Amino acid sequence: MNLIPTVIETTNRGERAYDIYSRLLKDRIIMLGSQIDDNVANSIVSQLLFLQAQDSEKDIYLYINSPGGSVTAGFAIYDTIQHIKPDVQTICIGMAASMGSFLLAAGAKGKRFALPNAEVMIHQPLGGAQGQATEIEIAANHILKTREKLNRILSERTGQSIEKIQKDTDRDNFLTAEEAKEYGLIDEVMVPETK
């Protein structure tokens, strides 16, 4: 059972109950906290477009705790982040794996973060093909083109060579927050303020 917390705000006009995600959206915060599929992508894209329409100058904050998911759904989010005018700050909490790590790197340069104990995992796209030989060949060619595109974009976003990206994504490659910074996937590890 998936419980979504409710926040109650009191104003001079009375009380109003929000689900937590709607309340965070008021502060320009979007939470990607699940596997990425078409429904999740449509929700994230809609929120990005809404926040741009509300104020095209203020930054948007995308918090990521995701195991990854659909490449095409992830590209929908990635392209929207690149398309809209406001800078999108990306913050990894917990884990940004696979397409989650790709979206973490998609944030505005200088505004990509991870919390100290967060993990990042990069790898090549996964695919499965079945059917006749020609169908398998078509699927294999498609996944190779997708891998080339992902590697090229990751190279641009991290400053690593395409050859290094190919080698490092050949298998699941887990990075600490500090290693993700050294690799160029993020710009800073967020250190908690002393209390």
From Swiss-Prot:
Catalytic activity: Hydrolysis of proteins to small peptides in the presence of ATP and magnesium. alpha-casein is the usual test substrate. In the absence of ATP, only oligopeptides shorter than five residues are hydrolyzed (such as succinyl-Leu-Tyr-|-NHMec, and Leu-Tyr-Leu-|-Tyr-Trp, in which cleavage of the -Tyr-|-Leu- and -Tyr-|-Trp bonds also occurs)
Keyword Cytoplasm carried by entry: yes
Protein EC: 3.4.21.92
InterPro entries xrefs: ClpP, ClpP/crotonase-like_dom_sf, ClpP/TepA, ClpP_His_AS, ClpP_Ser_AS
Domain of life assignment: Bacteria
Subunit structure as annotated in this protein's UniProt entry: Fourteen ClpP subunits assemble into 2 heptameric rings which stack back to back to give a disk-like structure with a central cavity, resembling the structure of eukaryotic proteasomes.
Function field: Cleaves peptides in various proteins in a process that requires ATP hydrolysis. Has a chymotrypsin-like activity. Plays a major role in the degradation of misfolded proteins.
Protein's name according to its UniProt entry: ATP-dependent Clp protease proteolytic subunit
Organism whose genome encodes this protein: Staphylococcus aureus (strain MW2)
Annotated gene: clpP
